[in-house]
Amino acid sequence: MPSQSVLVIGGGLAGLSSAIALADAGFRVQLLEKRPHLGGRATSYTLPDGSEVDNCQHVTLGCCTNLADFYRRVGASEKIRFYDRLYFVDREGRRSEIQASPLPPPLHMAPSFLLFDALTLADKRSIAVAMLAIARGGGNPPRTEGATMLDWLHSMRQTTGAIERFWRVVLVSALDEELARTDAKYGIEVFWKGFLSNALGYRVGIPSVPLAELYEGCREAIAKRGGEVRARCGVRRLCVQGDRFAGAILENGSEIEGDACIAAVPHDVLLNLTPREMAEPGAPLEGLRHIKTSPITSVHFWFDRTVMTEPFLTLLDHTTQWIFNRTLLSSGIETNGSKVRPTGHNEGTPGGEVRVERDGGDEAQYLQLVISASYDLVQRSRAEIIELCRRELADVLPATREANVLKATVIKEVNATFSPEPGVDRWRPAQTTPIDNLFLAGDWTQTGWPSTMEGAVRSGYLAAEAALTHFGQPTELLQPDLPVEGLCKYWARRSASGTN
């Protein structure tokens, strides 16, 4: 059994990824999580009636290489289903799809983009100009320094329709912030890595199980190395002696020791765990007080019949941004195109609908709606939010007008992500600290990514790398981005050499 032990405080993706990496490297890891479930902000809850729901539907993209590596390490890769088509619907009920063609990047999306019904020709022309600027700049176009994404779009002469029906739709969902409060750097990065530089970057991966089930392999992997995962185990404060971490005081008053510690908790929680002098003016954690957060609201509906055949929909011109067909996504039935394709006999109807039986023998369907940057909903009652979403469902899914709602619930994550406002990077600390054996993990640390699951895993790997270096075992854990392909590869080289 390894003689060196590492405490990991926090069982979200940042803590789990660092813990798994260290366990794989032979260290004895003790992971402490305050809540009963692992996953942090990407987890599941059990309702009083026994239904298990995600706090908010989380998705990955093909460009999230470190998250994919983490899922592989914990045996969860097969629980993620990837989709090659993105489905959109506007207030008039018009459907549009975006998918890659055989053309090389950045042209691979062009054929389906040209057929996107919700955009006018002028909208498409302006979007093409901005996309070309991103591609020719190798993901780093001019006029972005200190600018918001909205500023940059205006500088690129984007039409109102392009901003509201394309840029805003994609970016508010991806970054959980409004365009006027988003650093242009991060907005552009979403399109460069997800839609332009590689033909696989845009593919949407959705868990086929409740989020908490994705992390079941973590306990076993850590235990195999002599470690332990302790849920319902909160930490009151970290003990520091001189310039070294000495241990942690738990909420029950007991103390636990370790040869090193990775603090993988939300940035505001960290301030309450660490010595006060670490957050004083000029100290390493001073900037954490300046990091703002953004809310996400999820709304869950159970209908008495099938009302939706697509696996998911992105809504235009609505408060609701995404609808996820959880009945279909959890069914094990594969989809090909916009209709359901059963994998076996008698699993679907001729029209492509998936039929899920209730106890009474009737059809039932569970939909989850997601609203990012939901500032306007934070103070509204759950009844008001449910009514709003029910009206919007009727716009895009006519079958819901006659369907009965068996039950509905609302989950608000008021501090779901950190806000990627211009200049936020100056407040984000590194994974190392002045305390020799204390390291930080969290999407709010310096990862080069915004507040995403990919960013959380990157932080975990970087913290584990720092810990391994501390123990004299330097190891590279961070996975490379998808390769830049097609014309983008040529433009990226020219941009890097300063010849663009």
Question: What are the functions of these language-model segments?
Answer:
Residues L468-N500:
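Active-site-proximal substrate-binding core of FAD-dependent oxidoreductases
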Residues A23-P48:
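Glycine-rich FAD pyrophosphate-binding loop
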Residues V190-N252, D259:
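Helical element adjacent to the flavin cofactor pocket in flavoenzyme catalytic cores
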Residues L67-A68, R72, S77-I188, A199-G201:
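Mobile amphipathic helical/loop "lid" adjacent to a hydrophobic cofactor/ligand pocket
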Residues Q4-L31:
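N-terminal Rossmann-like FAD-binding beta1-loop-alpha1 element of flavoenzymes
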